[in-house]
From Swiss-Prot:
Mg(2+) binds at D62, D64, D117. Disulfide bonds: none annotated. It comes from Methanoregula boonei (strain DSM 21154 / JCM 14090 / 6A8). One of its GO terms (molecular function) is magnesium ion binding. It catalyses: a tRNA precursor + 2 CTP + ATP = a tRNA with a 3' CCA end + 3 diphosphate; a tRNA with a 3' CCA end + 2 CTP + ATP = a tRNA with a 3' CCACCA end + 3 diphosphate. Belongs to the tRNA nucleotidyltransferase/poly(A) polymerase family. Archaeal CCA-adding enzyme subfamily. HAMAP family: CCA_arch (MF_01264). This is CCA-adding enzyme. Its EC number is 2.7.7.72. Keywords: ATP-binding, Magnesium, Metal-binding, Nucleotide-binding, Nucleotidyltransferase, RNA repair, RNA-binding, Transferase, tRNA processing.
Amino acid sequence: MSGRLPFEEQLLSGQLRPSAEEREYIAGVARRLLDAINASGKATGMVVGSIARNTWVKGDRDLDVFLLFSPEMPREALETEGLALARSIARAFTPMFHEKYAEHPYINANVEGIDVDLVPCYNVASAEHIQSAVDRTPFHTRYITDKINGLTDDVLLLKQFAKAGGIYGSDQMTEGFSGYLCELLVLHYGGFAPLLAAAAEWRPPVIIDIGKHAAKKFDEPLVVIDPVDPRRNVAAAVSLDRMAEFVELARGYRDAPSEEFFRIRKEYPCCPADLAALLASRGTSLYAVTFATPPFIEEIVVPQLKRSTGAISDLLDRSGFAVHHAHYRMGPGRCMLLFELIIDELPPIRRHEGPPVWNRVNAEKFREKYRTSPLPGPFIENGRYVTEVPREFTRAGDLISSPAILSVGTGRHVRESLGKDWCVLEGADCWQEEFSGFIATFFSRRSPLVRIERDRPGRE
């Protein structure tokens, strides 16, 4: 494509475009899976996703195969019979498969080194008749395949750009840009470079309606109306922060384009000694809450982790323990909620404000309740009663270790896991090998562009 930077062409030919051999290998596996599905006589097989649309980055061996059933089949039957067929297909190719759950269950399998999802759905005539969220995916594939000609390389550049910036993926942890969203943005703006030129000037809300057929209003900062379903915002998962990071990256790349914008950076773990030294230099206190990961998919657990972290932070703040930063991580076996506090010890007394004196009924109740207290008060200040009361928790660790954290809005599945088994760690003892990368990034927060600028040779 004319106008493309030389290093962009080198990236495409060397790192991003799948080789002919890789394409044929995956196509062969896909053909055999489709033949097995079609031979069952129960469903029709269809390859969807980036592999079907020819927009997959070299090395991303994720194959999405849909099992299309008659729309006359009851929903319950689709879940049971669809899962049974997907399981039998997987079993014919590999012993390495297991059930996963989204809106309804599907099978994930490793077939000859390829990560395969076997997903039952309805074979509906149009997107207007979808009965479940996955039913629209075949229409996405057809739409992009029909229109992406000449822009495939631009999609590959955008996907790698977003991956390197840490904003690729619509999962709950990332809250970023899905592959389908990347494809639609390239289509709408006509290429990678025109997209970045436009994104550098974005100011939310940004509304893109490719089909000019939006069927409702949306509140998200970035709105991209699905051209096959006017009721859906393809960018609904994109958080305000991820959108801002994309804008920042677009500006940075246009100002000083380089390969650094496409280089994926590793998450470097810290060691216990590093953590101890870091905490000593910062003068803050660190607490971790760990517990068994609830047996549900990320889309269910992660929002509850986010809610739980916020609720416990609010509890700490209300109790006088100022939270400087808090975050969460879902691991395969355990979860961690991490809290950095400005202060973690307080005096045994605290100030307690009562009602205004002229609120007679409540004022007299307050005075009567506290008048025999050995602590100062009640006294009048600015027209209302004030007294001193004993502080329930003088140490943040005692509060976090108490049943009080089960009474805040943690989310049902997280609360159940906490109720069975939770562990509170303090200071350098918060270090856990499985969370060492998470802990390191917790203390090295920087925007994507700042990370790139700091990594450039010669930059201080």
